[in-house]
Amino acid sequence: MTEQHQPNLELDFAAHTNDWGEEPNLVAEPALDQAVEVQTQPVAERQRQITAKIQILQPVEQVWQVLTDYEALASFIPNLAKSRRLEHPTGGIRLEQVGTQRLLRFNFSARVVLDLEEKFPHEINFNMVEGDFKAFSGSWLLKPSLAEQAGTHLCYSVRVWPKLTMPVAIIERRLSSDMRLNLLAIRQRVEQLFATAS
């Protein structure tokens, strides 16, 4: 962890907006932007719980496959510069991720190390063990759709406690935007990989 880093506001999956580094190909259509439901809730002073949800028209197992291909995440998640597995002291799953983005005409980056717990095929919990936040934890929840067509309700929830170097209002706004874009990128990736197979 280095002092010159500013929180990237999205530990593992980063974000957009014009002056901040927009990814226009994923938000060109307002209908896409509305496909993601985002809720923000203060949980303590300078701490926020942010939850984003999306419907993906592919089975849970295929969404799980995309989420758990950890080393490939940087190839399709906006502004995620690096995602790689590290050796875990007890044999679990540990990731190092580096996000970069342009914020107010400056480039910022953040490095985090996450420990993950997988509960196949419905839940992935993560907790930051080292990085540029005071605390960052959350989960991915995958539930099968009850509709006739196979589908997945994907829910991404994070609890963030930023360091004092970044105003919490900016982080809240950034994370909400980031999470929306990340879920759209995941849905797009799942559809690219599996739509022709179904």
Model-flagged regions — what are they?
Residues 2-91:
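Hydrophobic ligand-binding cavity/cleft-lining segments
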Residues 3, 127-177:
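Beta-strand/loop substructures that line and gate deep hydrophobic ligand-binding cavities in soluble
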Residues 4, 43-46, 84-130, 185-197:
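Glycine-rich portal/gate segments that line the openings of hydrophobic small-molecule binding cavities
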Residues 34, 50, 97, 110-112, ...:
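One face of beta-strands
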Residues 47-49, 90-92, 109, 135, ...:
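A general secondary-structure signal for short beta-strands and their flanking turns/coil
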Residues 51-54, 83-85, 110-116, 137-144:
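Hydrophobic/aromatic beta-strand elements that line small-molecule binding cavities or substrate pockets
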Residues 56-60, 99-103, 116-120, 132, ...:
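Beta-strand elements of well-folded, non-transmembrane domains
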Residues 64-65, 69, 175-179, 186-187:
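Short, well-ordered alpha-helical segments
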